[in-house]
């Protein structure tokens, strides 16, 4: 949002963006790239951080913008950045399985969850991932990745030994609706930064669904390490 001109625009690619003439203060929604999920009974990828920054000062109406890319296989997402007069303003890329990020990645079976809000912002840019298996002998499913609006869901289901396909992947955390801030008229308004669903192992399991706002569903592993 360009104050004074009351113009709302959306930028989905990196580059130097030319705003309305005379623009010196903007309100911006900054959404980073989401992470990839893990393999096997892996945790879901965390959503990229989502921040609504109410007042960014600019030195001119030409603004360098970096739109963070999504993570490659098992990888973290990349930061999104707006370079203001006082320096870069950013949101943090999502955390892959067990990793911290804008929103944290879900846990793989017994590993720790990835923590969200890696940039230590207030209000927070995201949430933690969900938990995985219960004990080392129960390799059931991964937790869901955190979303901008909610933590990732924990894995669950009947308890069983490895290879029995007893687990249910955690759902991805829900995203956040930016429409109240930027209005419904913008083509890119809506819910963003949902977390990825946790994966599950074996044909009788259920993978986690993705969080609202772009989170991808987890997969069911029917082989070894896929």
What are these regions (language model features)?
Residues 1-4, 8-16, 25-226:
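Low-complexity, glycine/proline-biased repetitive segments and flexible coils/loops
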């Amino acid at each position: 949002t360009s104050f004074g001109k009351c113009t709302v625009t959306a930028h989905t690619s990196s580059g130097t963006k030319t705003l309305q003439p005379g623009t010196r203060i903007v309100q911006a929604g900054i959404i980073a790239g989401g992470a990839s999920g893990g393999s096997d009974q892996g945790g879901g990828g965390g959503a990229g951080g989502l921040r609504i920054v109410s007042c960014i000062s600019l030195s001119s109406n030409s603004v360098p913008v970096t739109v963070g890319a999504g993570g490659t296989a098992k990888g973290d997402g990349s930061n999104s950045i707006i370079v203001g007069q006082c320096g870069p303003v950013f949101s943090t890329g999502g955390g892959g399985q067990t990793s911290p990020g804008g929103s944290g990645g879900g846990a793989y079976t017994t590993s720790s969850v990835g923590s969200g809000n890696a940039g230590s912002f207030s209000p927070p840019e995201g949430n933690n991932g969900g938990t995985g298996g219960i004990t080392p002998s129960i390799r059931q499913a991964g937790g869901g990745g955190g979303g901008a609006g909610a933590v990732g869901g924990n894995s669950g289901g009947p308890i069983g030994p490895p290879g029995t396909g007893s687990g249910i992947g955690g759902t991805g955390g829900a995203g956040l609706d930016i429409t109240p801030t930027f209005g419904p008229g913008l083509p890119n308004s809506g819910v963003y930064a949902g977390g990825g669903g946790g994966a599950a192992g074996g044909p009788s399991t259920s993978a986690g669904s993705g969080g609202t706002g772009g989170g991808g569903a987890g997969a069911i592993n029917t082989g070894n390490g896929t």
